[in-house]
Swiss-Prot record:
Belongs to the conotoxin D superfamily. This is Alpha-conotoxin-like Rt20.1. Expressed by the venom duct. Residues 1-24 form the signal peptide. Hetero-, homo- or pseudo-homodimer (identical sequence, different post-translational modifications).
Length: 92
């Protein structure tokens, strides 16, 4: 595969690692905080509503809804519960 085609392929696939369609989660790195802020400020999203998991680490996860353990709840009215033997989960 020629170099230009490979570069275009990488540029097309790269954004998929930052936005997950299942739950609206955003994965951020230290150098991409401005991209995250712009994403959150579009429409009705606000950076103040972003809850970042693993603060201080190189990679973190931003939840637009409530965070429950290592995951984001799918809707804003959900709350976090603990299930015996299954761990934390969202109850909606």
């Amino acid at each position: 595969m020629p170099k230009l085609e490979m570069m275009l392929l990488v540029l097309l696939i790269l954004p998929l690692s930052y936005f997950s369609a299942a739950g609206g989660q955003v994965v951020q790195g230290d150098l991409r905080s401005d991209v995250l802020a712009r994403y959150l400020q579009r429409g009705d999203r606000d950076a103040r509503e972003c809850q970042v998991n693993t603060p201080g680490s190189r990679w973190g996860k931003c939840c637009l809804n409530r965070m429950c353990g290592p995951m984001c709840c799918p809707e804003s009215h959900c709350y976090c519960v603990y299930h015996r033997r299954r761990g934390h989960g969202c109850s909606c």
